[in-house]
């Protein structure tokens, strides 16, 4: 793709690569080969704790990238998005699930002003689910009721799950029962029923559904004034004032 046009491509003296933990090594090699000038400075930023695609790590449990000539600089260790309460939760989670996989921080430094004036409220709820059920009605109903009861502003709300089946049901409830506009990265319930009329589990997909998901993800916008629903892999939701996170029992701790 690039080789036949390499002389026409722009070359840059400085290249900044963010979220490097999501990159395959070959992608970075392409950037270096076709877009970097001869003496270009390439700076990569990565967070191994967000290695959701399970990219290979080096001997120090850090992202492996071809531009690296020395050890990773760990000076960027202060969070400007997490309050103290969330930071403590994140640290405990790392120690419980990531101790053998990553180098775990003993304490995350946070923004003091955020902790003073924007301390979050955290609740936990457990719902047993049956795989034979096509739609996760109990969870969808609970989240829908919470949004109505607390009168959350639509733009403040993000709902994340690894299970599109539940998100699809909740999106349908929000649109039909409360007339909410939503911002999603997957097919609607109506589209799913049309494209998979013989679905048995609610997890089925095909080329048409995958195309819809790709297009919706490309057009996803954080501040559209609507409730956002997404999978954990597509959107992390750190900036959302109100976040509903659905975690299934069958998720592997190493993922």
Residue ranges and their predicted role:
Residues 1-2, 14-255:
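Conserved helicase motor core of SF1/SF2 NTP-dependent helicases
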Residues 10-12:
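A short acidic, Gly/Pro-enriched loop at the edge of an enzyme's catalytic core
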């Amino acid at each position: 793709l690039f080789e036949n046009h390499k002389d026409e491509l722009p070359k840059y003296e400085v290249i900044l690569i963010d979220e490097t933990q999501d990159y395959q090594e070959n992608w970075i090699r392409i950037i270096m080969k076709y877009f970097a000038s001869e003496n270009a400075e390439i700076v990569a930023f990565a967070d191994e704790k967000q290695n959701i695609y399970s990219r290979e790590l080096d001997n120090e449990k850090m992202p492996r990238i071809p531009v690296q000539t020395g050890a990773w600089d760990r000076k960027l260790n202060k969070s400007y998005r997490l309050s103290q309460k969330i930071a403590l939760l994140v640290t405990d989670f790392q120690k419980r699930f990531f101790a053998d996989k990553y180098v775990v921080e003993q304490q995350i430094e946070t923004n003091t002003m955020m902790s003073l004036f924007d301390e979050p409220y955290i609740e936990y709820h457990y719902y047993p689910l049956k795989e034979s059920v096509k739609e996760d009605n109990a969870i969808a109903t609970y989240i829908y009721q919470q949004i109505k009861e607390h009168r959350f502003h639509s733009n403040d709300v993000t709902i994340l799950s690894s299970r599109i089946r539940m998100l699809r049901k909740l999106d349908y409830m929000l649109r039909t029962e409360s007339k909410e506009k939503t911002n999603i990265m997957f097919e609607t319930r109506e589209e799913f029923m049309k494209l998979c009329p013989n679905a048995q589990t609610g997890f089925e997909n095909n080329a048409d559904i995958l195309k819809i998901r790709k297009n919706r993800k490309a057009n996803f916008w954080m501040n559209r004034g609507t409730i956002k629903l997404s999978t954990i892999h597509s959107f992390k939701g750190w900036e959302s004032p109100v976040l509903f996170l659905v975690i299934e029992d069958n998720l592997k701790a190493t993922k």
